[in-house]
Structure formats: structure tokens, C-alpha cells
Amino acid sequence: MALPKANRLKSRHDFQAVFREGLRRNSSHFTLRALKPSSARKSSLDTAAQTQPVDEVQNIPSTLIGVSISTKVSKRAVVRNRIKRQITAAMQQLLPRLAPGWKLVVIVKPTAAESKCGSQQFLQELEQLLAQTEVLHGHS
């Protein structure tokens, strides 16, 4: 099942901002890049924040999630698409527990295609990465 449109990270500019300024956490199958809402607001809306009304500035947008999977992971698009579907399904399950306003990019490592992991292991690994970056509500 796909992520809701409101939670998809789509623009090249957003991806570049996350790669340039975001936190990085690694696991055996993924690298998670996460950009905090406050740092994103400071870098891109310095002058815009002064012109907007106060209540609009405090409106925190929903968490945006993107998945990056290169041909180095697998030459076959079928394999890459299957992994991407498993990741988006796992992120959709975790979506209600995510703090609002974050921009997240999940980068898939080649080990994800080599090991025949199920979506349950992907879910567990993503949950650990999100807890490390303190994106999950109730992280410890």
C-alpha cells in the first residue's frame, strides 16, 4: 500500500535539502537521512517567516517520506520495486507514531536485495533507525 500523498517527499529540492543538512543513521540494509522541522524552516524560510502571520508559521506540516533505491542495489526493476513497496508499507505502519514536520529519506543498501529479508525485518530495522534519530513518539 502506498503512502498518502500528503506524506510523500517528491521534489528534488527537498531531497537535496535532506541529503545536505539531515542527520544520518545506518543499519545493515538502510541509511536513514532525517531533517528536523526547525532546521528546515530556518534554512529555507528565513525571510518568508517574517512575512507570514504567526499562526501559519507555527503550523507544522506532516512528515514527508522518500525512498531512494539505486540500480546498484539490483539491476532488475522488479526487485527494486518490491523492496520499495515493502519499505513504504513499513513506513505507513509507523506513520501514526512519527513526530510531525520531519523530512525523511530511506536509502536502500545493496545488502537488502542480497538477503531475502521480509517486510517484518524491514519494519523492525526502520523502527530502530527512527528511534535513534528521535523521530518516533515515545522513543527511548
Curated annotation (Swiss-Prot):
Keyword terms of this UniProt record: Endonuclease, Hydrolase, Nuclease, RNA-binding, tRNA processing
One cellular-component annotation, GO: ribonuclease P complex
InterPro entries, A to Z: Ribosomal_Su5_D2-typ_SF, Ribsml_uS5_D2-typ_fold_subgr, RNase_P
GO biological process: tRNA 5'-leader removal
The keyword DNA-binding belongs to this UniProt entry's keyword annotation: no
An MF annotation (GO) of this entry: tRNA binding
Enzyme class: hydrolase
Membrane spanning stretches: none
Reactions the enzyme catalyzes: Endonucleolytic cleavage of RNA, removing 5'-extranucleotides from tRNA precursor
SUPFAM superfamilies per the UniProt record, alphabetical: Ribosomal protein S5 domain 2-like (SSF54211)
EC code: 3.1.26.5
Quaternary structure note: Consists of a catalytic RNA component (M1 or rnpB) and a protein subunit.
HAMAP family: RNase_P (MF_00227)
Protein family membership: Belongs to the RnpA family.
Biological role: RNaseP catalyzes the removal of the 5'-leader sequence from pre-tRNA to produce the mature 5'-terminus. It can also cleave other RNA substrates such as 4.5S RNA. The protein component plays an auxiliary but essential role in vivo by binding to the 5'-leader sequence and broadening the substrate specificity of the ribozyme.
Name this polypeptide is given: Ribonuclease P protein component
Native source organism of the sequence: Nostoc sp. (strain PCC 7120 / SAG 25.82 / UTEX 2576)
